[in-house]
Amino acid sequence: MSASAKEVAASLLRSFHTAAEGRSPYRHWFLRDCLPQSTVDEILSLPISAADLGGVSGKRELHNASRHYFDVANRAEHACAESVSSALQDPRVAAEIERIFGVKLGGTYLRIEFAQDVDGFWLEPHTDIGVKAFTFLLYLSTDPTHADLGTDIYDNDKKWVGRSPFASNSAMIFVPSNTSYHGFEPRKINGVRKSLVINYVTNEWRAREQLSYPEQPVTVAEPAFA
C-alpha cells in the first residue's frame, strides 16, 4: 500500500530534524531516511525510461525535452508522486523547512524533477541562485556502485572540495546563494543514477508545466509544528 501524504510528511520532518549540518564552503545539510521505504520503492519502479544523452551533458537544460517531473499529470497517474508532492506542499512542512534551514518559502512554487542520470552525465559547477529559493537533492538508486555518485561541492573559485554521500533515501540540502557551487564531476555511472531534484522556485519560473501545483503557491503554517 502506498504511504499517505501524512506519512511522507512525517518521514520528511524526522529527516529534517536529524540533518547533519556542514558550513564549509557554504552552509549545507546531509539527511538520511527521508521518505518511507515503500515510497522510495514505488518511485524506483515508475515506468519512466532514462533518456539517451546523445554524447551531450554539462547542464540539465540541454535535455529539457526528455526530462520528467512530478507535475500535474504524473501526480494524477502515480500515487507516490502525489503523496510526495502533497507532503512538500503542506504548509506545516514548509514552516519547518523555513525554521530549520533559514529560508523563506511563502509564495514559492514546488518543482520536483525525477532525474535519471546515465553514463556520460556530468554537471558543471553552478549555484542555483536566481529563481530557485531552496534545493533538496534526494538520492534514490540502490546500486552499491553508486556510493561515489553524490553531489560535488566547490568553493568560490569552483575548486572541488568535497562530495556528498550517496545512499538510497539520503539527501543534500542547501539554500542557493552566490557561493553554493555544486555539480557532478564526470565519472562512471553503472545503470541509472536515480534521484529527485526538489526545488521551491519563485513566481518568475517560466516553465509552469514543470510545477507540481502551477496555480497554487506555497503557504506557510503559523505556528510551525515539531
Question: For each predicted feature, which ranges?
Answer:
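Short linear sequence motifs
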Residues: 9, 19-22, 62-63, 167, ...
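Fe(II)/2-oxoglutarate
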Residues: 1-24, 210-226
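Non-heme Fe(II)/2-oxoglutarate
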Residues: 8, 16-100
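Catalytic core of non-heme Fe(II) oxygenases with the double-stranded beta-helix
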Residues: 73-89, 93-214
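A generic alpha-helix propensity feature with a strong bias for hydrophobic helices
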Residues: 39, 50, 168, 217-220
